[in-house]
UniProtKB/Swiss-Prot annotation:
Residues 299-487 form the Helicase ATP-binding domain. PANTHER family: DNA EXCISION REPAIR PROTEIN ERCC-6-RELATED, SNF2/RAD54 FAMILY MEMBER. Transmembrane segments: none annotated. It comes from Saccharomyces cerevisiae (strain AWRI1631) (Baker's yeast). Belongs to the SNF2/RAD54 helicase family. Involved in the recombinational repair of double-strand breaks (DSB) in DNA during mitosis and meiosis. Has DNA dependent ATPase activity. Promotes D-loop (displacement loop) formation with RAD51 recombinase. Modifies the topology of double-stranded DNA during the D-loop reaction to facilitate the invasion of the homologous duplex molecule by the initiating single-stranded DNA substrate. Required for adaptation from G2/M checkpoint arrest induced by a double strand break, by participating in monitoring the extent of single-stranded DNA produced by resection of DNA ends. It catalyses: ATP + H2O = ADP + phosphate + H(+). There is a cross-link at residue 615 (Glycyl lysine isopeptide (Lys-Gly) (interchain with G-Cter in ubiquitin)). A motif (DEGH box) lies at residues 472-475. Interacts with RAD51 and DMC1. The gene is RDH54. This is DNA repair and recombination protein RDH54.
């Protein structure tokens, strides 16, 4: 083998691609001459002799693209791996595939290679495959076919071909080869290989790992730094500015995105809730009619308060107020120095990062829709747990919600589901900043597992929403209050000793004339009101009258059928009641049975109390198979009149599913289209049923179980509602009647209440008119409050005995108690009486002097008369503005449907109370 001859030639610097010019050698200032340089002329060899022979075959880089026409070019999209639900691409680029290779090479838009991946086994899925290239995910977009596109791709990729790995240092000068005639190289090596290192650019700002520039946390800088609120109050029309304490650094201003939609009572509500959750004392407002929501007051701290009870009536917008408060606390904080801020001093995060909303499962969808309606779910992350999830999936979702930031801020969960994920919440309870409990009266039972689970989370800021905070007694009231603000009422033993016992004694009818007990009870009541009004806000739906269409309330007294009267007599005779030992609890089964008779005698045979206590009677078959009743006749006549006389929809409400079954069969026989919602309907189907009824004009009626759906159930597609039977708890009926008269309603509303004349229906109605006294006393409903009657328990055993009496000779027992008018449709004005003065006189005479038996009997008769007068007075107050109408004397009931159907109903309606809306009054 012939070996090429070695020639010792001077070093020749490399030539730049595309350049034929060489720069002359310019010695550097630091060069050291160690030998004299020949004076011979320095020449440059333009021809570099390369010996023939074998050469080193270097491996080609992926950047060195072949010019082979068999190479295929693609456009690509790439991104970093992410777990987000809605993924986006971060960049575009190119991919190449050589015919002789099964490897795709990926480049970014600048032509820089960043990875490669093997082809998938299935060539048909080439464009659906997600490739892994380095730290990126890559997907092919389309293949380049046009010559212009391929040429453009080649140009982009060729930019980095010459220098795929650019060095960090560069040589500033090169030395051409020099030689003299002696052939001896005389350039010093130190000068030949001298390099100038390029210095890296130094940033003038300090390096940080944070994504945003934050304000230094040093105390010295904090004092010098000025902070500013998120919103400029000068650029907002009618802003809502929150109150603050002396330590606040910036104002908290409600986002105008929400603030512009809030009504005056909602603005006040948001500010009240904010004060409570921030632990601020209540301000002293001299004139409550002046709007103070546009000003920020500096208040003292109240260490006893960190929670709030919003007890507004249904329909006042408790959900919207809560969402406004949540959004405000997520975005803003008055303590700017404790969070990251922008360079201009604006807080970048709020006081709360994670908020837990607990509600009935039927309201989860409604809460999420409300967040989407008012904020748009792109602004705030709201997580709900799917009903299809397994328990493990729910637990994982809760863990991710608490630990992963910036994705979800609000978790909405049902009360029952809370128990299954309680362990995950307990482990990370320090991450939950706020708790919202909708329908908070569910937490009234101190032994409830749900209540104890929420207590174990130890969340400081709590907000409870309810329209019925006090339903039975002060024991339940204490449970709710102690959960909101622990310890504010002391221990239960001390609360019972100081408040429950004296207040209960004062309300006991046996102590109605004991001046000492009554005064002590009143004193304790006022003391408790002063404590609770610091964090309880209660408004009635009377303030909605100027925002909603007019509403006409009609109470119709329906004449019972002969079969019903017979059933009442047989049941009461068969029950063999001992009124001496009778209590409300022991007689509850009998009361329920009598209520069913009012609805339809056909419900008697299947009643458990009837089967176990009432034996077979001679006339059982004559009424147990009858479906007729006075209320059913009035109901079907009303439905037919609404369907024919108007284009409106109607909601029919009952407390019993068996009653709904009878009504549903009658509507089917009459060809009335309808839908139904009761406790048997799965929660996930309820929203679709309600939406279908509200939007589908072909659906005429909606059958509703009174206790189904929660307060968030809106049936504004209907403008007429018929309450077929009453519940002992007035809040249940009020909630049911508010389904149609709320935000979103465009038509005048008509509410019909059907009552069986002279029977237990009327007694329940009368009790409802008085049972609100406890809530009115402690929650501030002062408009309809009678201070004297609210101090007494207005029902005793005589009243309970009266429940089981049937008055067949009256047109309305309720009207007989309160009025002696002729029922000509006039509105009766009631003068103030000296009832309170008479009561005080009886108290003094019964406690300060010795009494003989004759005088005692006389006083007892006076007391009974006084009690009846008090009941009448209170019922009259509840029926203020109602017109008294006797159909035998007056055929105008301020409703065209009843008026047009009056010929058919004249023998079925014995009396009516009507409270007309504004439109009805104008028409008259």
């Amino acid at each position: 083998m012939q070996i090429p001859k070695y020639e010792n030639k001077p070093f020749k610097p490399p030539r730049r691609v595309g350049s034929n010019k060489y720069t002359q050698l310019k010695p550097t200032a630091t060069a050291v001459t160690t030998a004299p340089i020949s004076k011979a002329k320095v020449t440059v060899n333009l021809k570099r002799s390369i010996s023939a022979g074998p050469t080193l075959n270097l491996a080609k880089k992926p950047n060195n693209l072949s010019s082979n026409e068999n190479t295929r070019y693609f456009t690509i999209m790439y991104r970093k791996p992410t777990t987000k639900k809605h993924k986006t691409w971060s960049g575009d680029g190119y991919a190449t595939l050589k015919a002789s290779s099964d490897k795709l090479c990926f480049y970014n838009e600048a032509g820089k290679f960043f990875g490669s991946s093997m082809l998938p086994s299935d060539s048909d899925s080439l464009f659906e495959t997600l490739f892994k290239a380095g730290s990126n995910e890559v997907q092919l977009d389309y293949e380049l076919k046009e010559n212009a596109e391929i040429r453009s791709a080649k140009e982009a990729l060729s930019q980095n071909m010459g220098n795929p790995n650019p060095p960090t240092t560069s040589t500033t000068e090169t030395v051409p080869s020099t030689k003299n005639d002696g052939g001896k190289y005389q350039m010093p090596l130190s000068q030949l290989f001298s390099l100038n290192t390029v210095k890296r650019f130094k940033s003038v700002t300090k390096q940080t790992n944070e994504h945003m520039t934050t304000v230094p946390k040093t105390s010295q800088n904090s004092k010098a730094k000025k902070y500013y609120p998120v919103f400029d109050v000068n650029k907002i029309d009618n802003p809502i500015v929150m109150n603050k304490n002396a330590a606040a650094e910036v104002d908290v201003i409600v986002d105008p995105l929400l603030g512009k939609f809030l009504r005056p009572h909602q603005r006040e509500g948001v500010k009240f809730m904010y004060d409570c959750l921030m632990g601020l004392a209540r301000p002293t407002i001299e004139n409550p009619d002046i709007d103070c929501t546009t000003k920020s007051l500096v208040l003292e701290n109240d260490s006893d308060i960190s929670g709030c009870l919003l007890a507004d009536d249904m329909g006042l917008g408790k959900t919207l107020m809560s969402i406004t408060l949540i959004w405000t606390l997520i975005r803003q904080t008055p303590f700017a120095s404790k969070v990251s801020c922008s360079q201009s001093g604006i807080p970048l995060t709020g006081l709360c990062k994670k908020i837990l909303v607990v509600c009935p499962v039927t309201l989860i969808g409604n809460w999420k829709r409300e967040f989407g309606k008012w904020l748009n779910l792109s602004r705030i992350g709201v997580l709900t747990l799917s009903s299809r999830n397994s328990p493990d999936m729910d637990k994982m979702a809760v863990r991710n919600f608490l630990k992963v930031q910036r994705i979800y801020q609000v978790l909405i969960i049902g009360y029952e589901k809370l128990l299954s994920v309680s362990e995950e919440l307990e482990k990370n309870k320090h991450l939950i900043d706020m708790l919202v409990c909708d329908e908070g009266h569910r937490l009234k039972n101190g032994a409830s597992k749900i209540l104890n689970t929420l207590k174990s989370l130890d969340i400081r800021r709590k907000l409870l929403l309810t329209g019925t905070p006090i339903q039975n007694d002060l024991n339940e009231f204490f449970t709710i209050i102690d959960f909101i603000n622990p310890g504010i009422l002391g221990s239960f033993a001390s609360f019972k000793r100081r408040f429950i016992i004296p207040i209960t004694r004062a309300r006991d009818t046996a102590n109605r004339y004991n001046e000492e007990l009554l005064e002590k009870g009143e004193e304790r009541s006022k003391e408790m009101i002063e404590i609770t009004k610091r964090f309880i806000l209660r408004r009635t739906n009377a303030i909605l009258e100027k925002y909603l269409p007019p509403k006409t309330d009609i109470i119709l007294f329906c004449k019972p059928y002969s079969q019903q009267i017979l059933a009442f007599k047989d049941i009461l005779q068969g029950a063999r009641l001992d009124f001496g030992q009778l209590t409300f609890s022991s007689s509850l089964g009998l009361i329920t049975l009598l209520k069913k008779v009012c609805n339809s005698p056909g419900l008697v045979g299947s009643d458990p109390y009837y089967k176990s206590h009432i034996k077979d009677t001679q006339s059982q078959d004559s009424y147990s198979r009858s479906l007729n009743s006075g209320k059913l006749r009035v109901l079907m006549t009303l439905l037919e009149g609404i369907r024919k006389g108007t284009k409106e929809k109607v909601v029919v409400v009952s407390n019993y599913t068996q009653t709904l079954d009878i009504i549903e069969n009658l509507m089917n026989m009459a060809g009335m289209s309808h839908c139904r919602l009761d406790g048997s309907i799965p929660a996930k189907q309820r929203d679709s049923i309600v939406t279908s009824f509200n939007r589908n004009p072909a659906i005429f009626g909606f059958l509703l179980s009174a206790k189904s759906g929660g307060v968030g159930l809106n049936l504004v597609g209907a403008s007429r509602l018929i309450l077929f039977d009453n519940d002992w708890n007035p809040s249940v009926d009020l909630q049911a009647m508010s389904r149609i008269h709320r935000d979103g309603q465009k038509k005048p509303c008509f509410i019909y209440r059907l009552v069986t004349t002279g029977c237990i229906d009327e007694k329940i109605l009368q009790r409802q008119l008085m049972k609100n006294s406890l809530s009115q006393k402690f929650l501030g409903d002062s408009e309809m409050r009678n201070k004297e009657s609210s101090n007494d328990d207005l029902f005793n055993k005589e009243d309970l005995k009266d429940l089981f009496s049937v008055h067949t000779d009256t047109k309305s027992n309720t009207h007989d108690l309160i009025c002696s008018c002729d029922g000509l449709g006039e509105e009766i004005e009631y003068p103030e009486t000296n009832q309170q003065q008479n009561t005080v006189e009886l108290r003094k005479r019964s406690t300060t002097t010795w009494t003989s038996a004759l005088d005692l009997q006389k006083k007892m008769n006076e007391a009974a008369t006084n009690d009846d007068a008090k009941k009448s007075q209170y019922i009259r107050q509840c029926l203020v503005h109602y017109k008294h109408i006797d159909p035998a004397r007056q055929d105008e009931l301020f409703d065209e449907v009843i008026t047009d159907s009056f010929t058919d109903l004249k023998d079925s309606i014995t009396f009516a109370f009507v409270k007309p809306g504004e439109i009805c009054l104008r028409e008259q």
